[in-house]
UniProtKB/Swiss-Prot annotation:
Keyword Lipid metabolism included in the entry's annotation: no
CC terms in the record's Gene Ontology section: cytoplasm
Lineage: Bacteria, Thermotogati, Deinococcota, Deinococci, Deinococcales
Gene name as annotated: murC
Database matches in InterPro entries: Mur-like_cat_sf, Mur_ligase_C, Mur_ligase_C_dom_sf, Mur_ligase_cen, Mur_ligase_N, MurCDEF_pg_biosynth, UDP-N-AcMur_Ala_ligase_MurC
EC numbers: 6.3.2.8
Entry function: Cell wall formation.
GO molecular function: ATP binding; UDP-N-acetylmuramate-L-alanine ligase activity
Pfam (any one): Mur_ligase_C
Chief place of localization: cytoplasm
Family membership noted in the UniProt record: Belongs to the MurCDEF family.
PANTHER family attached to this UniProt entry: UDP-N-ACETYLMURAMATE--L-ALANINE LIGASE, UDP-N-ACETYLMURAMATE--L-ALANINE LIGASE-RELATED
Name of the protein: UDP-N-acetylmuramate--L-alanine ligase
Amino acid sequence: MPQLPMTDSAPLPTPAPSSPAQPSAQPSLHYHLLGIGGIGMSAFARLLATRGHRVSGCDQNLGAQTAGLEAQGIPVAAGHAAAHVTEEPFGKIDVLVASEAVPKSHPELAAARAAGVEVRPRMALLGELLAAGPSVGVIGTHGKTTTTSMIAVAMYGAGLDPSAFVGGNVPEFGGNARTGTGPFVAEVDESDRGFALLGCETAVFTNAEDDHVGGELATYWSTVEEQHAGFARFVAQSGRVLFCADWPGLDTLCSGAREQLTYGQSAGADYRAVNVRPDESGTTFDVEFRGERLGEARVSLPGTHNVLNGLAALAVTHLYGGDFDRAARALADFHGPGRRWEIKGERGGALVVDDYAHNATKVASAVQAARQTGRRVRVVFQPHRYLRTQQSWPRLADALMDADEVLVLDIAAASETPIEGVHATLITDRMTQGGHPNVHYCPDRAAVVRDLRESAQPGDIIVTMGAGDVYRIAEEVVGGSA
């Protein structure tokens, strides 16, 4: 087997398949999580509970995540109140965990400080989990959730028994978190500036663009340069980095890493996907490590971006000593985390899919994945956030041009205040001016559902895209009566 590359310092030892995460030195504590129904906080809740801690939480909006937590014995209160910290039903709290985006005036934060309860930022908690033992942190503007899921699934298939912290629900794990005895695999979200204070054993760097920049959110970045410096800092504070050789500029951002490895289709990548064979439901390819063939792999999700995500997963599993063939079989059986190319069903012979794509690169990748199926591509796109739309509407419009039909909904505000002049019609007008023959602004969601139910036919693929609640349209199209 080719040797791992040497750097000025000795490379990290490859952990044995059974290497356990180091147990926390802390005694059992009572953690109270603000916004426990969120995808990240609910994952923290599950991880902390399986590590023997007492966990409680609250959220303004109760739903499937909070119901799942309560079914696991984790109490959840509706809304936010100082009494959640100082009185029953939760009892004495040792640590309150909150996002840095939560205002200091929040009643539970204020009550915790007054009572002498430790307030711990969520990124600090993630940092502790990453530092506790062998760890893999996935960073980048796009593909983090899918790549993190694929790494954890491939490692699990290879017998490495990973723990996982994922920004999406992984069917193989029954949720967004898993506790095992092997390496801890975590999605590290750059939307929280605190990520730049962290590091891990192996950083996986997918790509870098502009997102979560500007605006009023406390955790967002002032400039894209500042954000990319945060990526570079995370990499430099990690033991080694595996970065995508196909993405321009990552080599520069990774120049401070102690040990560098690359993956991609580019010539010279350490881990390389070759002989790539796409079909309507996914892609088969061969994996090489420094010119030596490791074996054949398949991702059961269409799109070139998913080849790269899957390649990263197999590379990490190989780095940690996992069996390639077992990892490849597990990866081939994986059909994605929730809201990432999630097949909702059929209507009138049309395939109905939902995808979280919400910025231009993700949208373009999702459209390309839809085209790979060979079907007529019908997209329902919901722009996400006024600021993001203001910053990128021309690119969003251009990313949608390859779809056969595009229906654009109103912008999902995501708690933002509307910005004057920023409207979904910026996207549709640009597409029309660019020559797209079948793009429509559709403020009436019920009419969209009705039209799709009536017009869906064999040979179509209907893809709902966006980070808001556009997935509900896919569910209504599939589940509604004829």
